[in-house]
A protein has these predicted regions:
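Active-site HxH/HxHxD metal-binding segment of metal-dependent hydrolases
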Residues: 25-110, 195-199
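Single conserved hydrophobic/aromatic residue that forms the stacking wall/gate
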Residues: 1-6, 11, 206-213
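Residue-level detector of beta-strand structural context in well-folded domains
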Residues: 7-8, 101, 106-107, 129, ...
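Surface-exposed alpha-helical segments enriched in charged/polar residues
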Residues: 31-34, 61, 163-170, 209
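Metallo-beta-lactamase
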Residues: 82-86, 115-202
C-alpha cells in the first residue's frame, strides 16, 4: 500500500517504507511516516535539486536510512550551485555528506520484497530518473500532469528530455504517475492530454523502423 507524504510517495512493505525524494521538511515527513506506523529504511532520489533533497541529511541523522541517487546527480548532494540552492538563494539548508548508494538504469532497487525498475530520463538534470514499481511510476521532475520539467537551468537539456519522453511514451500499460510536483495522473491521460508526451509519441512513429514487406 502507498502513503502520501506531501508531494512525495512513501511505499510500504510490511512496516518498512521508502521515501521517493525528500523535500525540506523532515519533521512533517517523519510525522506522516510515524502516523502510518512505518519505519523509514531508504530514500530514493529522482534527481539532485534542493527541493527534492533538502531533508536528506536530517532524515538520515534521525532514522539511519539509506540514500540512493543516480551516479550523474550524486555531486549535487554537496554542491549548492548544482542543486540550485544558489540560484534560488536558499539559505540554512544542510548538505548531505554521508554514505550514498549510486545506481544506473541497469540496477533494480529493492525494499524488502518490493522492486523498483530505474528508467534513466535525463533532461531536467543529467541524472534524472523515474522509478517504476508495479503499475506505479514516480516521475520526479521529468513528467508532470499536462506538463514536463524545466530544461533551462544548469545541467538541463531539451533534446535529452525529448528523448526521455519518447522512452516514457513507449512504456506499456496505464501506469499511475506520481510526479514530483502537481497532481497524480496516469500515463494514458498524459498520452492523450500532455502536449509534450504527445509530441514524443509522434516522434516515435517517425523514428520506428518500417515493417518489412
Amino acid at each position: 500500500s502507498c502513503s502520501l507524504v506531501g508531494s512525495e510517495m512513501c511505499i510500504r512493505d510490511r512496516n518498512n517504507c521508502v521515501l521517493i525524494d525528500a523535500p525540506a521538511d523532515p519533521d512533517y515527513i517523519l510525522g506522516e511516516i510515524e502516523s502510518h506506523g512505518l519505519t523509514l529504511k531508504k530514500i530514493f532520489l529522482t534527481h539532485g535539486h534542493f527541493d527534492h533533497i533538502g531533508a536528506v541529511a536530517d532524515l538520515v541523522d534521525r532514522t539511519g536510512c539509506e540514500v540512493y541517487i543516480h551516479i550523474m546527480d550524486k555531486p549535487k548532494l554537496t554542491d549548492d550551485a548544482g542543486m540550485l540552492a544558489n540560484l534560488f538563494r536558499i539559505r540554512g539548508h544542510r548538505n548531505y555528506t554521508g554514505k550514498v548508494n549510486v545506481f544506473t538504469e541497469d540496477d533494480i532497487l529493492k525494499l524488502d520484497e518490493l522492486e523498483f525498475d530505474v528508467l534513466e530520463t535525463p533532461g531536467h538534470t543529467s541524472g534524472s530518473v523515474c522509478f517504476i514499481c508495479g503499475m506505479n511510476m514516480f516521475s520526479g521532475d521529468t513528467l508532470f500532469s499536462r506538463s514536463v520539467g524545466r530544461t533551462d537551468m544548469p545541467d538541463g537539456s531539451s533534446t535529452a528530455l525529448m528523448k526521455s519522453l519518447m522512452k516514457i511514451a513507449d512504456l506499456g500499460g496505464n501506469l499511475t504517475v506520481y510526479p514530483g510536483h502537481m497532481n497524480v495522473t496516469t500515463l494514458d491521460a498524459e498520452r492523450k492530454y500532455n502536449p509534450y508526451l504527445r509530441q514524443a509519441a509522434d516522434c516515435l512513429l517517425y523514428t520506428s523502423p518500417s515493417p518489412r514487406d
